[in-house]
């Protein structure tokens, strides 16, 4: 059961402090189309958690209404090993876009799970295509993650800090939506992948931007 965000806000107003960061699937796909114009197919990488299943359902609904010409392949951690995933990405051409959501794999030892950020970096360095993501976790780090459409880490930190300060000051809880969301791109990866900076939207937040870039 998916409870609407506004219903939660109304029911728990003043009792909880929540920092809410939406996932911008529609805007992410539009950005991918803009930066990789030949894209006719999408590989959406996710795992078996409930939130991943919800993202796949949202993706199916959005592509049906807004991107009906786009063929979507759902690459799910339960259906293949990480090596199989990397091998699959090697066989896709430039017409295939790659969007990463999550790839949690259960460890062979106990019930622990391997952090998906490691897989994200491995995938970004192995894939022939630029790797787009849905949050600012691995952009501007030692990876080949290109970026995506979401709030920056600085924006998230700002809202979390405000929520903590209000709580420590004894103020009633509040619900905050992290803003603004915008295209976020690693300039070095952009150049390595052969994508023209001229294709970037005017409101793009650019990591590693050269001093002479306008």
Spans of features found by a protein language model:
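Short hydrophobic alpha-helices and adjacent helix-cap/hinge residues
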Residues: 1-214
């Amino acid at each position: 059961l998916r409870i609407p965000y506004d219903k939660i806000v109304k029911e728990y107003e003043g009792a909880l402090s929540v920092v809410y960061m939406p996932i911008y699937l529609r805007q992410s796909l539009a950005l991918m189309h803009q930066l990789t114009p030949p894209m006719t197919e999408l590989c959406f990488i996710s795992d078996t958690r409930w939130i991943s299943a919800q993202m796949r359902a949202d993706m199916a609904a959005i592509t049906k209404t807004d991107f009906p010409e786009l063929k979507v392949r759902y690459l799910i951690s339960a259906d293949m090993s990480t090596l199989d995933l990397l091998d699959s990405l090697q066989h896709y051409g430039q017409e295939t876009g790659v969007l990463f959501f999550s790839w949690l794999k259960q460890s062979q030892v106990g019930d622990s799970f391997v952090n998906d950020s490691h897989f994200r970096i491995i995938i970004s360095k192995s894939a022939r295509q630029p790797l787009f993501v849905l949050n600012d976790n691995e952009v501007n780090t030692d990876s080949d993650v290109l970026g995506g459409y979401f709030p920056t880490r600085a924006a998230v930190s700002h809202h979390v800090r405000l929520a903590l300060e209000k709580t420590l000051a004894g103020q009633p809880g509040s619900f905050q939506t992290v803003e603004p969301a915008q295209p976020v791109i690693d300039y070095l990866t952009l150049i390595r992948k052969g994508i023209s900076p001229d294709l970037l939207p005017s409101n793009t937040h650019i990591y590693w931007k050269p001093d002479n870039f306008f």
